[in-house]
Amino acid sequence: MGVRKLKPVTNGTRHAVLYDFEEIEKLVRKGKELVLVKKNKVEPEKSLLKWWHRAKGRSRQRGNITARHRGGGHKKLYRIIDFERDKSLVPAKVVSIEYDPFRSARICLLHYADGEKRYIIWPEGLKVGDTVMSISWEDAEAGKPLPEIKPGNAMPLKYIPEGTIIHNIEFMPGKGGQIARAAGTWAQVLGRSTKKGYVLVRMPSGEVRMIHERCMATIGRVGLAEHELVNVGKAGRARWLGWRPHTRGTAMNPVDHPHGGGEGRTRGKHPESPWDGRRRDTRREGVRSTPISLS
């Protein structure tokens, strides 16, 4: 499960490491029986698909480039994902694990007991046929029984034990998960903050932040941790994914990049940003990040 290395029979396959899609599967009803189908036979839930405007790295208003080296790529439909996990105390059965062209992680389709269907990010260890549940802040505060601490269940940070691995974490209550949603990512609950109503969480970057205890989080690590091993192998596959060629700064004009211009080929300078001349290897700390106290 995860990735496979292609035989080096051509230049495009020499270094290619691609997904094997072994985790893709779905329960399909055929007559009176439920049959498990695999890989390319798994089709998405049509009621949860929608057309998505593809900006291709450009502004909607002026059309100028806002994200370089993007554009083209295969046509794709957006899968509507439930990042809020706001359906409280209704059990849901995992019916499928599917590919999502808009993200590195896999997604899984849930069939709730009341008939509703939703997609969520696929956590590592969750299998087709398993049952998951979430609980809202209001129900948890009212003393209703909490779901089990296992992959796929969701609850407010206040009720998640210290040391638990989590993903799909909200920054603001009710806004939906924004942290740790990519393949293989995770965060960890460290404990209560000295500031009332906040929980200390170690981010995927290693930074420790205070997040409000009412914010929802999902138990477990995002699946497909092998994503970091993927090598597309050739430029054409990168174009299928919507990536355009990266132009070197030394090949540009002086108006376009600090490394541009000069007579003939030039050696370049120390790495600089095309916009403000800052060094590329420095990381600016977030000015608006929440200060924390570990004392």
Curated annotation (Swiss-Prot):
Keywords, in A-Z order: Ribonucleoprotein, Ribosomal protein, RNA-binding, rRNA-binding
SMART domains: Ribosomal_L2, Ribosomal_L2_C
A GO MF label: rRNA binding
GO CC terms: large ribosomal subunit
Annotated region (Disordered), positions in chain: 243-295
Annotated signal sequence range: none
Protein name: Large ribosomal subunit protein uL2
Gene transcribed to yield this protein: rplB
Species the sequence originates in: Aquifex pyrophilus
Self-association and partners: Part of the 50S ribosomal subunit. Forms a bridge to the 30S subunit in the 70S ribosome.
HAMAP family: Ribosomal_uL2_B
